A protein has these predicted regions:
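A short glycine-rich beta-strand->turn/loop micro-motif centered on a GG-aromatic cluster
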Residues: 82-90
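A generic structural motif
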Residues: 28-32, 91-97
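Regulatory modules associated with amino-acid/nitrogen control
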Residues: 1-77, 82, 103-117
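Short low-complexity, flexible loop/linker segments enriched in glycine and/or proline
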Residues: 99-101
Length: 117
């Protein structure tokens, strides 16, 4: 996976299975497959960071649930694994650097979490 800062939302494409576009008053961001990153942003990329892998919390998360992501991030932080998180209406997607992915999955499984790539 790739995380990009892009110049504008113009011509950003939603091709691919996992694409997130973020817009604030300060920036536009794109998260997508590294393979697709060149075609997703069509020359709009200002800065990018490759080498992420993604897992999601299995199941639909009710908005009344509290602390799920905080607990997951605490487990990973205690083991010095940085995260980048994006969310949809149904669930959260956690990105970790590829070299930490297997260890992160093992730590979360040992803590009883059901996550899927």
């Amino acid at each position: 996976m790739t995380v990009c800062r892009v110049a504008s939302e113009a011509e950003l494409r939603l091709d691919g299975d996992l694409v997130f576009i973020g817009k604030t008053d300060e920036e536009y961001s794109l998260v997508c497959s590294t393979v697709c990153s060149g075609t997703q942003s069509v020359g709009q990329t200002v800065e990018r960071e490759d080498g992420w892998r993604c897992f999601r919390i299995r199941g639909v998360l009710d908005f009344s649930l509290i602390g799920i992501l905080a607990k997951i991030s605490a487990i990973l932080a205690e083991n010095r694994i940085g995260i980048f998180v994006v969310s949809t209406f149904n669930t959260d997607y956690v990105l970790v650097k590829a070299e930490n992915f297997d260890r992160a999955m093992g730590l979360l499984a040992a803590a009883g979490y059901s996550v899927t790539e």
